Amino acid sequence: MHIDWWTLGLQAINVLILIWILSRFLFKPVAAIVEARRASIARLLDEAHATRVAAEAEREKARQEVTSLATARAAALQKAEDEAKAETETILANARSEAGKLREAAKADIARARQDEAAAMADHASQLAVDIAGKLLSRLPEEARISGFIEGLAQGLAALPEAIRTNIGATDAPVQLKAARALTEAETQACRVRLSEALGHPAEIAVDVRPELIAGLEIDMPHAVVRNSFRADLTRITAALIQTGSMQTGQEAPRPETP
């Protein structure tokens, strides 16, 4: 085989020139294009990654906002429920208090009405009893209005403690004796004798005429009260009647005035 070195050399030179030309006008531009495309792809990838990161951040922010809104809504609903419950309790408490006040006021009104009715009945009964007693006594002898009450008054006086009886009439001041009418000399003497016996020492009396007693005698002093009269009996009877009526209605009876 014969090798033509000049031809081979020329071909080698052609190859080198071709390689230079390709490198100059093909490989470098293509490499530049590839590098530019790679850089563009890398940039796009970076932008996509940044966009994805931003999207993830926005989604997390939105999730947090939704959670915050849900928490705030739940808190607002709970607060509204608590306020409504407290307001309801306040309204109910005020209503119960007002109802209690109305009940107490109604009870007080009923009690006052019953007491007024009982007092009116007591006054009517007392006046009726006085009228009846007056009519009955008008048929009796005048001496019966006094003589029949001397012994009972003396017994009541004798029942007082000794210390009190000792002080009654012990000074020069006479014992104040209330009588339904003026006493005769005999009645005055009978009262003086019997009361002195009950007291255990002599005592003078001063008669104070009180027609409202109807019949009977009374001794009314700051430290001792002894009553034996129709008026006192009527007062006790009226009080007993009122007390009985009040017990039936469950109310406290008004106390009648003592004559």
UniProtKB/Swiss-Prot annotation:
GO cellular component terms given for this protein: plasma membrane; proton-transporting ATP synthase complex
Keywords: ATP synthesis, Cell inner membrane, Cell membrane, CF(0), Hydrogen ion transport, Ion transport, Membrane, Transmembrane, Transmembrane helix, Transport
Function: F(1)F(0) ATP synthase produces ATP from ADP in the presence of a proton or sodium gradient. F-type ATPases consist of two structural domains, F(1) containing the extramembraneous catalytic core and F(0) containing the membrane proton channel, linked together by a central stalk and a peripheral stalk. During catalysis, ATP synthesis in the catalytic domain of F(1) is coupled via a rotary mechanism of the central stalk subunits to proton translocation. Component of the F(0) channel, it forms part of the peripheral stalk, linking F(1) to F(0).
InterPro entries hit by this protein: ATP_synth_b/b'su_bac/chlpt, ATP_synthase_B_chain
Species annotation: Beijerinckia indica subsp. indica (strain ATCC 9039 / DSM 1715 / NCIMB 8712)
Family: Belongs to the ATPase B chain family.
One Pfam family cited in the UniProt record for this chain: ATP-synt_B
SUBUNIT field: F-type ATPases have 2 components, F(1) - the catalytic core - and F(0) - the membrane proton channel. F(1) has five subunits: alpha(3), beta(3), gamma(1), delta(1), epsilon(1). F(0) has three main subunits: a(1), b(2) and c(10-14). The alpha and beta chains form an alternating ring which encloses part of the gamma chain. F(1) is attached to F(0) by a central stalk formed by the gamma and epsilon chains, while a peripheral stalk is formed by the delta and b chains.
Domain of life of the organism encoding this protein: Bacteria
Location in or out of the cell: Cell inner membrane
Encoding gene (name): atpF3
UniProt-recorded name of the protein: ATP synthase subunit b 3
Membrane topology: Single-pass membrane protein
Bilayer-crossing regions: 5-27
One annotated GO molecular function: proton-transporting ATPase activity, rotational mechanism
